[in-house]
Amino acid sequence: MKVRNSLKSLLTRHRENRLVRRKGRLYVINKTQRRFKARQG
């Protein structure tokens, strides 16, 4: 999982990327291409 300051650029890289908030943190998840997983930090 990548840790990035800004998730907006990662979100546009694949059309199945989803922005999810869990435990106060923002995550980008992708069910088909798992390599796009990221957390804002």
UniProtKB/Swiss-Prot annotation:
It comes from Rhodopseudomonas palustris (strain TIE-1). This is Large ribosomal subunit protein bL36. NCBIfam families: PRK00831.1, rpmJ_bact. GO terms for biological process: translation. The keyword Ribonucleoprotein applies. GO terms for molecular function: structural constituent of ribosome. InterPro entries: Ribosomal_bL36, Ribosomal_bL36_sp, Ribosomal_L36_bact. Keywords: Ribonucleoprotein, Ribosomal protein. Belongs to the bacterial ribosomal protein bL36 family. GO terms for cellular component: ribonucleoprotein complex; ribosome. The keyword Ribonucleoprotein applies. The gene is rpmJ. It comes from the Bacteria.
